[in-house]
């Protein structure tokens, strides 16, 4: 990674955690490591990102899907990021292809429930801790 203000190469190990996701995505695309029809799995990609950058990341992921035909499987605990995905999917006219699942704890396991038609269940759960304050 190059910082124009410093004119020095910044080693990946010295980058902030938030910057690393953008760098990895850029490298995967520029190296042609991802091909149409591939599945990119990203685990909580919004971690260490300011909410504004979460929106930017959501748009990048939606564009990777829309323009490159690469499927994205992401999990998140961020209502900002999830909402940004919903909004950007609509903006890029691919909202009908998006699916949203919520993991619910049962007595012995977690059960995945499709909440695409009512994502409020996700937001209710994510905002629940605020009610404890």
Identify the residue ranges that each predicted region occupies.
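Switch/communication elements of ASCE P-loop NTPase nucleotide-binding domains
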Residues: 2-131
């Amino acid at each position: 990674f190059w910082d124009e203000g410093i004119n020095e190469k910044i080693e990946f190990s010295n980058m902030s955690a938030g910057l690393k996701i953008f760098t990895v995505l850029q490298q995967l695309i520029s190296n042609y490591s991802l091909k149409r029809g591939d599945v990119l799995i990203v685990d909580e990609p919004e971690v260490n990102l300011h909410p504004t950058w979460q929106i930017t990341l959501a748009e990048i992921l939606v564009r990777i899907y829309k323009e490159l035909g690469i499927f994205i499987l992401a999990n998140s605990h961020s209502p900002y990021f999830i909402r940004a995905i919903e909004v950007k999917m609509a903006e890029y006219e691919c909202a009908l292809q998006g699916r949203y699942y919520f993991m619910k704890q049962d007595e012995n396991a977690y059960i995945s429930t499709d909440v695409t038609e009512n994502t409020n269940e996700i937001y209710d759960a994510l905002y629940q801790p605020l009610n404890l304050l």
